Amino acid sequence: MSTYSRPVLLLLCGLLLLTLAIAVLNTLVPLWLAHENLPTWQVGMVSSSYFTGNLLGTLLTGKLIKRFGFNRSYYLASLIFAAGCVGLGLMVGFWSWMTWRFIAGVGCAMIWVVVESALMCSGTSRNRGRLLAAYMMVYYVGTVLGQLMISKLPTDLMSVLPWVTGMVLAAILPLLFTRIVNQGSEHHEATQVWPMLRLRHARLGVNGCIISGIVLGSLYGLMPLYLNHQGVSDSGIGFWMAVMVSAGIVGQWPIGKLADRYGRLLVLRVQVFVVILGCLAMLGNAAMAPALFILGAAGFTLYPVAMAWACEKVENHQLVAMNQALLLSYTIGSLLGPTFTAMLMQNYSDNLLFIMIASVAFIYLLMLLRKAGEHPTPVAHA
């Protein structure tokens, strides 16, 4: 059976449209609020409500998939996200937008859980690395294209909302032409999320997703601030961020293929070591282009490899719950990482960004080295 079957390709097409909409709104919502002269703390609260919605959506989706299946869960998640988009146009204000962004956050997290779980259930331990690499490539390409659309199209609220909402609704169409089946789970009770977090033999994957959240959350949220403090112009910041994200896109396919061929443990060790090297290069004032490229190529590919590691440790009927647990772990890391790193940067030095990332990467590397040889490679799930 081909790795990229018809259902997988249609699912990724829908994801691309959704990611475009998510990227556009995540960039423009803070700007729209700033144009309405809302104080910074309220803009931050609206952003936090979106991530709080992510947490709730992650926890709800497993039971939804068990009851309604992948297709109908995907439709519902897309409609919830579309409602969160439309609501922004009803009234501009702190409480109103905090509510609608919370709803959008729930819908986005549900979409991610459905798509990631469907990909996990569509593959085996021999090709999940490539499936997740394709997923992350689509996600990052959609993010970059979303930023390009912002630079080329009008960005006022009522100009953006109609086509963004239309894009979300259009993302439903591809899955109308296929049916994604959760094979092997029909005769099992829904697995709970919390026991997945405590599985000893999957702990490296869970920890890897937390570390990935810390690394990516810090790079996404604080790298622009670091570059700004170094005297880089706004256009220059956009360029260097594009270099880093593009490196993540380029790295997805080869790293996913290497993980499938040589094992995820070896690839994770190399990735984490390269992240540390990238941080040391930035701290040592090395040439920024190669330093950011290797940091992006290694850091932005941690999540799919760690996820594939954890998912190959559980049975097919546990994949949805495990995926929820991993996305929850990633979200927690992406919330906590930038918060603590920003405090350290403010009180001490901007270099703490790379010291923090290198430190958590080093801790994870020690875990990976300590676990060497403890867990045999499992039999591939059919």
From Swiss-Prot:
Main location per the UniProt record: membrane
CDD domains listed in its UniProt record: MFS_YcaD_like
UniProt keyword Nucleus present: no
GO-annotated cellular components: plasma membrane
Stored InterPro entries: MFS, MFS_dom, MFS_trans_sf, MFS_YcaD, MFS_YcaD-like
Membrane topology term: Multi-pass membrane protein
Pfam families: MFS_1
Transmembrane feature ranges: 8-28, 39-61, 75-95, 102-122, 131-151, 157-177, 204-224, 236-256, 265-284, 289-311, 325-345, 349-369
Similarity-based family: Belongs to the major facilitator superfamily. YcaD (TC 2.A.1.26) family.
Name of the protein in its database record: Uncharacterized MFS-type transporter Ent638_1421
Species lineage: Bacteria, Pseudomonadati, Pseudomonadota, Gammaproteobacteria, Enterobacterales
Keywords: Cell inner membrane, Cell membrane, Membrane, Transmembrane, Transmembrane helix, Transport
Species in which this protein is naturally found: Enterobacter sp. (strain 638)
Cellular localization per UniProt: Cell inner membrane
Molecular-function annotations in GO: transmembrane transporter activity
Superkingdom of the organism of origin: Bacteria
